[in-house]
A protein has these predicted regions:
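C-terminal folded domains that constitute the principal catalytic or ligand-binding module
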Residues: 124, 143, 159-161, 166-171
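N-terminal catalytic or cofactor-binding beta/alpha core of small enzyme domains
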Residues: 1-136, 149-158, 178-203
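Broad hydrophobic/π-residue packing in well-ordered secondary structure
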Residues: 58, 139, 145-146, 163
Length: 203
C-alpha cells in the first residue's frame, strides 16, 4: 500500500515548519507500506490544487497530512474538517478569506477516515503526548483536510484521509514560553501514525 504524507512550507514569518521537517525525515517504508512525502504550499488555493495533482498521479491508499499548531503542547489528531475558510493572517499568497467555504456547495463537515483514536492510543503507549482534536481551525490546515476528504468522497471512496497537528520545535520558541516538542519525537509520532494506518489497511 501507499501512504502519502504531506507537510507544509513555513508561514507567518517563520523560517521552518515542523510539519515538513518531521515528514521529510520519515523512512520510505514502514509497516509494509510505502511512504511518499511531499511539501505542500501554505496557500488556500494552491494547497488543494497540489493535493489533487498528487492524488491523481500517485493514487495512494491513504493520506496523512501534517501541519503546525503553534501553542499546542502535544500531538493533535484531528477528527473533523469544516467547510470554512476564515483566516486570522494571510496565507503565503497574500490571501486572507473571511467566512468563505472551502468548496462551494460542499457538505458542512467531513470526519477523518483514518483510525484517529487508535493513533492517539498508540502514541500515548509510547510516551508521546497526544490527544484527539475536534477543530483543525479555519486556516490552510483545515482547508487541506477538507479538500482531501471531499475529493475522497467524490472520486476515491476507499481512500483514507486524516490530519495530525504538531507543536512548535524548540528553536521556534525564542522566549521559551510557548510549548514545543523535539523533532525526534515528532518523527516517531508520525511513524507511529503511519504504522497504525498501514495496519488498519491490512485488515
Amino acid at each position: 500500500m501507499k501512504i502519502l504524507v504531506t507537510g507544509f512550507t513555513p508561514f507567518g514569518g517563520e523560517q521552518i515548519n515542523p510539519s515538513w521537517e518531521a515528514a521529510r525525515r520519515l523512512p520510505n517504508r514502514i509497516g509494509g507500506a510505502e511512504l511518499i512525502k511531499h511539501e505542500i504550499p501554505t496557500e488556500f488555493d494552491a494547497s488543494g490544487a497540489a493535493l489533487h495533482k498528487l492524488l491523481t498521479e500517485l493514487r495512494p491508499d491513504a493520506v496523512l497530512c501534517v501541519g503546525q499548531y503553534g501553542g499546542a503542547n502535544c500531538i493533535r489528531v484531528e477528527r473533523v474538517a469544516i467547510n470554512l475558510r476564515d483566516a486570522r493572517i494571510a496565507d503565503n499568497a497574500g490571501k486572507q478569506p473571511t467566512d468563505e467555504p472551502v468548496v462551494a456547495g460542499g457538505p458542512d463537515a467531513y470526519f477523518a477516515t483514518i483510525p484517529t483514536r487508535e493513533i492517539v492510543d498508540a502514541l500515548r503507549e509510547q510516551g508521546i503526548p497526544a490527544q484527539l482534536s475536534y477543530s483543525a481551525g479555519t486556516f490552510v490546515c483545515n482547508n487541506l483536510l477538507y479538500c482531501a476528504l471531499h475529493e475522497s468522497a467524490q472520486s476515491y471512496p476507499a481512500l483514507r484521509c486524516g490530519f495530525v497537528h504538531v507543536p512548535y520545535l524548540p528553536e521556534q520558541t525564542k522566549d521559551g514560553n510557548a510549548p514545543s516538542m523535539g523533532l525526534e519525537m515528532m518523527v516517531k509520532a508520525l511513524e507511529t501514525a503511519a504504522e497504525v494506518i498501514a495496519e488498519e489497511e491490512k485488515q
